[in-house]
Amino acid sequence: RGKVMKIFSMFDGVGGFIVGLENSSKEVFQTLYSNQYEPSRKTQDAYEVGLYRFPDIEHISTDVALIPNEKFEEMKANGVDMIVGGFPCQDYSVARSKKNELGIEGKKGVLFWEIIRATEVIKPKYLILENVDRLLKAPSSQRGRDFAVMLAAFNELGYSVEDRKSV
């Protein structure tokens, strides 16, 4: 029996990564922390779903930018060695016109840098991130710039990146 991978799920939504990983093997994957916050909502429905479905996880319902580095240090001390997340896609999505596309500079696109901040502090062995395929081409005025910036940010931290299309 191998070591359990301890997980921090960022931009957790209703827990898709948690369900997928734990369904594949509860002996291998254990989520310790999750973060879900909906800034424009009076109610935090996705967060409430997480509390109900996953009562043994520490749920953090605040803007990820407001999570102090000390919390990430705690996660590191508690053995978190994997970060997963589907960071907000609105600034890349086809639901937004290409003319109004802001990509990594948009209100939600900048949240990518919070993944980098958490990674810098926690230093996980692995990261699994997902986003819409339009991210690869954003912004339309400089196709692929944002994805290249993201790859460079992970490279600077010593991570190699694998890009896989979903099926």
Predicted feature locations:
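Conserved active-site and SAM-binding loop architecture
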Residues: 1-167
